[in-house]
Regions:
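Helix-loop-strand module that forms the ligand-binding subsite of alpha/beta enzymes
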Residues: 1-62
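Glycine-rich phosphate/pyrophosphate-binding loop and the adjoining helix
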Residues: 59-120
Length: 120
């Protein structure tokens, strides 16, 4: 999971990406372009945000989601599944609802994650 900082990934996640995404390690350059060395498995990405993004209530752009899609595809991860807890800096009751929605989503995908692990 990751928060959104200044419309995109926080510095700590960017540092991790820079350490992992390496030519001849996590991707190779071919005549057809970059080819990831990882076998694509489902990747579940939780995003937390103080405001709203990617909806009719949005007050901020979302550069995080397209960036993660592009950079993870570079290393071979194409099956990305995003879910979010938005508006976390707002009214306490809304935060409780968002938190419960995120928890419900995680509980619903739990069996899917377990099945993915079994197929590894």
């Amino acid at each position: 999971g990751t928060p959104i900082h200044n419309f995109t990934v926080p510095a700590s996640l960017k540092t991790w990406i820079d350490l992992v995404v390496r030519v001849n390690r996590s991707f190779n350059i071919t005549p057809a372009g970059k080819v990831g060395t990882l076998d694509s498995k489902p990747v579940y990405i939780a995003i937390a945000s103080g405001g709203f993004f990617g909806s009719e209530h949005s007050r901020q752009p979302d550069f995080l989601t397209p960036y993660l899609k592009a950079i993870l595809a570079t290393i071979g991860l194409h099956d990305l599944r995003f879910f979010s807890a938005q508006g976390m800096a707002l009214d306490v009751n809304k935060v409780k609802v968002q938190r419960q929605d995120a928890l419900d989503h995680v509980m619903n995908i739990g069996p899917t994650i377990a099945e993915s692990k079994e197929s590894c």
